[in-house]
Structure formats: structure tokens, C-alpha cells
Amino acid sequence: MDDDQRRIPKFYDLSVEERVRAVHERGIVTLDDFRSLATGKHTLALEAADKMVENVVGVMGLPLGLGMNLVVNKKRYVIPMAVEEPSVIAALGSGSKLISEHRGVEASSTDPIM
């Protein structure tokens, strides 16, 4: 599936269930991820959290949203973001739309120097 076929117009207007289905149908998430997201139960178990970081005392949930259609080096990306501020993902979406209308951005890096 090429980048244009992976686009999901008006993604923000879809219900949560429709968004999960749409990203799976376009190959953005795996079948296992789709099944996990479709359950609506995403709480990290305390036992798992304790193995991930030191001094665990609890788990805090944040909404997981997707920044859609960021074009970098002529490839379209979907950016997962766990944030509590609604305008962050909306701003990424607006910026991505403007950028993609002008062929996206190009990124490069230098060889490591250390």
C-alpha cells in the first residue's frame, strides 16, 4: 500500500473504534496491536511497570493519539503520542497537512563524531 492509500481523511471525525479499524486496515498497526487497542483496556500492570523502571509506586494513564501524515524524506509517517494536552496532536496534524502540501520536509544527519 503506497503512502496516499494509507492516508485517512477526516481521521479526527471518526469514532475511536473507527480509527482503530482504519489504522489496522491500512497496515499502520499489526493484528496484535489492533486486538489490544480494540479492547479499550490498556492499563499497564503494576508488576510490569515495576520491571520497567525503579521505585515504582503506581501507574498513570495518558490518552494515546496519532499525529497523522507527517511527510519526511518523501515518506509518510504516523506519530503515536501519549499526551494530556489536546492541542499538541491537533497542531501536529495541522502542521503536517501544510508541510505535506509542499512535498514534506527533508531530514539528514552527519556521521557520528564520537
Language model region names:
Residues 111-114:
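Flexible hinge/switch segments at interdomain interfaces of large molecular machines
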